[in-house]
Each structure stands twice: as structure tokens, then as C-alpha cells.
Amino acid sequence: MRLYFITFCLLLITLVSCKENNTAKTIKLAHGLGVSHPVHKAMVYMADRVEENSGGKLKLEIYPSSQLGSERQCLELLQIGSLGMTKVSAAVMENFSPDLRVFGYPYLFRNNEHRFKVYDGEIGQKLLLDGEKFWLHGLTYFDAGNRSFYTKNHPIHKPEDLKGLKIRVMQSPTAINLVKSLGAAPTPISWGELYTALQQGVVDGAENNLPSFYTSKHYEVCKYFTVNEHSSVPDILVISTIIWNDLSSEEKKWINDAAQDATVYQRKLWHESEEEALQAIEKAGVEVYYPDKSLFEKESSGMIKSLKTEDKELYDLVQEIENVK
């Protein structure tokens, strides 16, 4: 029912947009992050570049903070062409494009340089377009850093400390299996509902990157952050193929060029925001721990090993990524 209501609202927005400006083409972009998040700022930057590149002929209209629905709902709206663009985690996209689940596997990348080489190289670009058969055209990867655990009642020093804890995860089978492999009880909850879930004790903690932990104000509830960096799942900027196929080659170039500019800008912003977030949460009284990551890597290593017999194709993809120099 909510999806129908959102679709109806989007149709009204479209009608209003057409009346206000019958010369410029407007594409609606919705996402679930707050306006202070570096990824939102990068999308605003991209919108400015699109308008500049097109001389005002093409515009992006941004709806942040889950105004038009959850990540999953936004993807479904893209599939029917009721929404133009969205930003989602690759973990959510894996429900539509299964190979993207590779990014959710633990300790896949050696470092940030390795990660960006994969995103920007042949492997990453192939995966980016893998959702086209589901009417989802990937434009670029936005950096989402490394995911770590944060909790309410006690710190996490080693995997054993997670046992029995209810940890919020994304709607992703891979994320669920990873947290389960470390002994915790994975609990899928939408991002917009997580603050309340933490407050009310529905979950004992969650896992995410530092900037998201800070901008969501989860530090007000969770006073322990463990930098174990178990996975590095990028965000993906996606456009509906229904909308994409209706654009001229010139309009596609305006968008692609702006997306690439925004990617460079976003990575710079992300690096700065990680440092700012760390300082801010420590000032707010959060205890930050740097555990021996090898303990978490060893405990979760069975996930990749099991692929050799359970999913040879995905195992080969993991090997390809690990071999990128």
C-alpha cells in the first residue's frame, strides 16, 4: 500500500514539475541518507554538474532521508519508471544482481587502493551494469568506507564478544551470513528505523561505517565503536533503464560526466568525513577500540572457503578480485 501511495505522489510531483518548467527535463533522485551525509553532498554536487553540463536543459531533483521510501522501495519504483534515480548499498542491489554480493564478503580488499582499483576497473564496471536485466542501470560507485561494529552495552574486543548479541544488518543474505559467522544474531531492519530500534533495545548494536554512525546520531545511543572493518560495501548510483533508454546520447553523456566528477568529489569528502566523524564521536563520549582484525578475519574466513564447493562462479570472482594488483 505504501508503495502505491509513493507512486501516486511521484506522479503528482511530475505533473507539478512539468507545469513549473516546460523547457527543462527533470529526473527525480531519491535516497535514504540525511543531508549532512557526504554521499548526499556528492549527489548535490552531481546535480549542479548536470545542470551546468546541459546548460539548464536537464536537472536532477533530490529527495533525501527516505522521503520516497526505503532503498528496496526506491529500486522497485525505478523498475517501473516511476522514479528516475536512487543511491543504494550494493548489499541491497544483490537481491537484483546476485554477483554484487561479492562486496559483502569479509576482508576482501587489502586496502583502499585495492578497493578503488576493483571499483574503477573491468570487474567493477561489469558488475555495475549487471542489473540492467532488472531495469537497473548502474552509473558509478560511491565510497562507503569499511563497516565495523558498534554496540550499546559493552565493547567488542574479539569475535566471542558478539555471541548472542542482536546486531542490525541490511536486507542482504551476505550481511546476514557474515554476522552469523561471527556468532551474533543478525537482525534486518531498515536504516530509517534503526535509531528507534537501538533506543528500545530491539537490537544490541549494528554495523556500519564511521560517517554513517555519526550523521545518523547513533552515537547518542551506542557508546562503543569497534574498528574491526569486516567488509567494504560500496554505494551504487542507479538510474532506471526505462528513463535511461529514453535519454538522448547527449543527455546520457551529461549524466555520465557528472557522475564521474561526483565520484572523485565524493571520495575526497569521504576521507575528510571519516576523520571528522572519529573526532566528533570521541568528543561525544564514544569509546573507540582497535582490535586485532585477524581474529575477526579468521572467524569469518569460512564464508569464502565454502564458496569453493557451494558457488564456484562466485569463488572465481573472489579470486579475480584478490588478484587485482
Regions found by a protein language model. Give the residues of each.
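N-terminal secretory/targeting leader peptides
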Residues: 18-114, 123, 131-325
